[in-house]
Regions:
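A polyampholytic, Gly/Pro-enriched intrinsically disordered region
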Residues: 1, 131-142, 224-239
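Extended, charge-rich low-complexity interaction segments
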Residues: 6-13, 140-160, 234-241
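A charged, amphipathic alpha-helical module
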Residues: 1-123, 153
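Peripheral docking tails and interdomain loops at the edges
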Residues: 187, 192-241
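Acidic beta-strand-to-loop metal/phosphate-binding motif
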Residues: 173-182
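Flexible loop/turn segments at secondary-structure boundaries
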Residues: 94-98, 118-124, 161-162, 183-187, ...
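Flexible internal linker/loop segments at domain or repeat junctions
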Residues: 112-158
Length: 241
């Protein structure tokens, strides 16, 4: 085991220059289009792109991602913003883009994806500092900046709330949807506290749901999402009160 680990460590060291050469922020650049008042990409489309980028060999998918990025720079959005609200989606893993599509068909665009397999914080650039190997940089990043809900100390909890608040501000979200997959206890605890913090202390409307791994109980979820979106619309009409 030690020999295998040492060989892998050597590979990381050897590939530092390769990492720097291939370093790319294409997914981040594509995702940033969602910050626009009338984005040229939907949350569902971005979810598909993000998922594909995680399961396809990079050397095969990068040319297509670069092509997509260039297309989005000249893509004309709908004449009028086609959604009734903008939301940040936070929580357990969501590897089914149909879940994002469900939210958007209810009337809310998912402008930021802060969940397991999402681009926040999964697509954050890992800085390789002077004198560090790629392996060291990855270890440092995950030990000091990991946003997983399994880290339960107060500093990490506050850090996660601050990051979601930052996303809501940057992407001009009207509200936040916290979801946890059934039996994911970490996000189950997180969403309860987050609902209180965001609703009562930060003044950001928050919806919390529990979901199965497979997209079931669609009618129930649709009812919850529609009611939440309606409450966001009412808040907009009342001037954010």
């Amino acid at each position: 085991v030690h020999s295998l680990f040492f060989l892998q460590y050597q590979d990381f060291c050897r590939h530092k220059k390769s990492c720097q050469f291939h370093d790319s922020a294409i997914i981040t650049e594509i995702g940033n289009f969602r910050k626009a008042d009338n984005p040229s990409i939907t949350g569902y489309e971005f979810h598909v792109i993000q998922l594909v980028s995680q399961v396809c060999p990079h050397r095969l998918i990068l040319p297509y991602l670069a092509e997509t990025l260039e297309e989005l720079k000249t893509r004309e959005p709908e004449p009028k913003f086609p959604f009734r609200a903008r939301v940040v989606l936070v929580g357990s893993e969501i590897d089914d883009p149909e879940f994002t599509k469900l939210i958007e068909t209810c009337g809310a665009m998912v402008v930021a994806d802060r969940y397991c397999f999402g681009s926040f914080p999964g697509r954050e650039q890992i800085e390789i500092r002077e004198g560090e190997t790629a392996f060291d940089a990855i270890c440092r990043h995950y030990l000091h900046w990991n946003q997983c809900a399994r880290f339960m100390d107060g500093m990490k909890i506050d850090q996660r709330h601050s990051e979601v608040k930052k996303l809501a501000d940057e992407f001009k979200a009207d509200g936040v949807i916290y979801e946890n997959m059934k039996f994911c206890e970490f996000w189950s605890y997180e969403k309860i506290l987050a609902h209180h913090i965001f609703t009562n202390e930060l003044g950001i409307p928050t919806c919390t749901i529990e979901k199965e791994y497979a997209l079931g109980a669609v009618g129930q979820l649709r009812t919850r999402f529609q009611a939440f979106i309606e409450s966001l619309e009412i808040k907009q009409i009342q001037g954010g009160k």
